Amino acid sequence: HRAFFQNYAGGKPLLSCGIKDYHIGALSMIPGLLAGLEATGTTEPSTLLESVLSLVRSTHNHPDSLRAATDLTRLLCALTSGDSIQETISQLSLPGVSIKKLLKWEKLEDRRVVGDTLSTACYLPESFLASLHFAWKYHDDFSAAVLANARVGGDNCHRGVVLGSIVACSHGVPEQWLEGLSALSTMPSLNLCDTVSQDLNRAI
């Protein structure tokens, strides 16, 4: 976040440079952070969540950003149990996420959902809910999910990170999206064990 660097350049302590910002960009580093922690052998539930929240606080220190960060962390970890995305979202009972609305929205054109009902802008919590709409509707098709998200415009980049990580965690990423990545062989997958997933949910 540019404000982080402005504050840091102005002499503020590193951990005090975040601002009260509630944009979905706050969530963009969470999938990579969780994968990195796993790669270093860090799987303690309280450590995972605190690491995520510490990262988000450092740039987007706002209740809506921290709430969405917690929910995304819960969702990504819970998906490792093998349940479908729709089953997992239903079971987690995420605050502000209506399963009834997700069921209704999946029958509508995407622009009626993200554009008319929900804003295409970056502001949380609507942008997180918009990401969940695409992850729910296209739960078994990574390509369809990310392309549908791109087509509605707005802050589709950060929404794409969120919904892409959710669908990829459940079904992986098609080879066509990975071709040409020079460091692919060194990239660990997000594969937290079932026990960690369950413990994290209890901790929250």
Q: What is each stretch, according to the model?
A:
Residues 1-204:
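Structured, active/binding-site neighborhoods that engage oxygen-rich ligands
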